[in-house]
């Protein structure tokens, strides 16, 4: 599945054939078909496992926070760090999630989109608990999507051997949240 994710990331899902995946795996197309009946089946299993992994991370962070009696902000910060650690090792799977879900059949796409919604809902809850004075029903979607906007596309530009590590980037994201959400929003004065 990791090899297939790499093929999808390099060539795009539509441009990748079963021959390409088999060649990248160093096996025959017939052997690949022994395990998967189609390229769609590979994509679905890849995305199904990856989205399940993201939900497991959320559960692990919640359990660790409970055991360690972390406050809500520390719990959110732990989640951001955990997601970015996962993104560092799952760049091609994450790219497939963001770019290739649309190519699944309706039922399979629905499963993956529901999982994505579950992840977004969980992050929204983490944000609301961490910054109850700033995140509410009015702005929760915008703030949640801002956070995802900061972290979801790291696979396109953040390199483990680059000048900024994933851990250091997590510190930057957390600092931006802290500076941006820990103080009351200034209201515009009437003109």
Task: Provide a role label for each language-model segment.
Residues 46, 50-53, 186:
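Alpha-helical bundle regulatory/interaction domains
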Residues 10-14, 90, 133:
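Short coil/turn segments at alpha/beta junctions that flank glycine-rich nucleotide-binding fingerprints
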Residues 3-41, 45:
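Helix-turn-helix
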Residues 84-124, 135, 156-158:
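Short secondary-structure transition hinges
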Residues 85, 89, 120-129, 148-150, ...:
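C-terminal peripheral helix-coil segments that are non-catalytic and often amphipathic
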Residues 18, 40, 44, 69, ...:
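Short, structured helix-loop boundary elements
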């Amino acid at each position: 599945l990791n090899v297939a994710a790499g093929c999808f990331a390099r060539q795009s899902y539509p441009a990748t054939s079963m021959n390409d995946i088999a060649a990248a795996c160093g096996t025959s197309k017939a052997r690949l078909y022994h395990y998967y009946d189609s390229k769609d089946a590979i994509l679905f299993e890849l995305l199904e496992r990856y989205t399940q992994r993201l939900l497991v991370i959320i559960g692990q962070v919640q359990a660790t926070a409970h055991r360690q009696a972390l406050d809500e902000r520390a719990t959110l910060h732990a989640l951001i760090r955990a997601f970015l650690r996962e993104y560092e090792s799952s760049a091609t799977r994450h790219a497939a999630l963001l770019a290739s879900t649309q190519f699944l059949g309706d039922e399979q796409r629905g499963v993956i989109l529901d999982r994505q919604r579950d992840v977004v809902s969980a992050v929204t809850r983490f944000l609301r608990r961490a910054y109850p004075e700033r995140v509410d029903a009015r702005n929760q979607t915008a703030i949640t999507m801002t956070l995802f906007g900061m972290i979801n596309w790291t696979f396109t530009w953040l390199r483990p051997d680059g000048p900024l590590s994933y851990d250091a980037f997590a510190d930057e994201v957390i600092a931006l949240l802290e500076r941006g959400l820990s103080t009351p929003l200034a209201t515009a004065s009437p003109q």
